[in-house]
Regions:
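Long, amphipathic, heptad-repeat alpha-helical coiled-coil stalk/linker regions
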Residues: 16-169
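Extended amphipathic alpha-helical segments
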Residues: 2-26, 33, 157-223
Length: 224
């Protein structure tokens, strides 16, 4: 391998190391942003549908049983209870998450986002089925649907961003490993050439010594 080829590979190595550093920082930033989006989706959007959502005993702001004269199929008596229980659990998850914000792994954040997505998807099924009744206007229903839609969009964005950042890191690690292997092969390939060059110099020196010895033997010294 020629020196200029080695120089090119060494430059590629530096670029790959820079790309990996960027990917690592981007992933860390994405993990932090995931919490921000999750917090906004739950506490600024979905919590509008609950009374005292952070109290440990949240209640929906509307009664699902009031809807059963108007919707098909009817809401089950446990639908409201289950979504309220899930809301309470999501609040607990967010509190745990923020406590380890700088150390949460990709796997942990992925699980958190997945839980919130499932919660919001089920909440959307409820709000999309709501109809106007006494104490619940269509404008209010539209507000609830809009809040849940915004929350779901936030979470989907967070999930997609995390996937992209993880893929970028994986690709950067693979690229760096490849360049390191190429550089190792290039350096190994240059070794025989270096040895041959040194051997040639040694042989050349030996030839000069042989000429001098022959001239001495002949009784005269002539500059080689």
């Amino acid at each position: 391998t020629r020196p200029e080829e080695l120089a090119i590979t060494e430059t590629e190595l530096k670029n790959a190391e820079t790309a990996l550093d960027h990917a690592e920082k981007n992933l860390q930033e994405t993990l932090l942003n995931s919490y921000t989006k999750a917090d906004d989706a739950v506490r600024n959007q979905a919590d509008q549908l609950f009374i005292e959502p952070r109290s440990g005993n949240p209640d929906l702001v509307f009664s699902l049983l009031d809807q059963n004269s108007y919707v098909e199929p009817d809401f089950d008596s446990t639908d409201g209870i289950l979504i309220e229980v899930e809301s309470r659990q999501i609040e607990k998850d967010l509190m745990v998450w923020v406590g380890k914000l700088n150390t949460a792994s990709v796997a942990e954040v992925t699980v958190n986002l997945s839980k919130i997505k499932g919660f919001l998807d089920r909440l959307a099924l409820i709000t999309n089925a709501l109809v106007e009744v006494i104490g619940l206007t269509q404008a209010t229903i539209d507000d609830y649907r809009g809040a849940v839609a915004t929350a779901r969009a936030d979470i989907n964005t967070a999930i997609n961003n995390l996937f992209t950042a993880t893929e970028e890191l994986n690709n950067a690690e693979a690229s760096l490993a490849l360049v390191r292997r190429e550089l190792s092969l290039d350096q190994a390939g240059s070794l025989p050439q270096v040895i041959l060059a040194q051997v040639a110099k040694v042989n050349q020196a030996k030839a000069k010594v042989a000429i001098i010895e022959a001239q001495i033997t002949g009784g005269r010294i002539v500059a080689p």
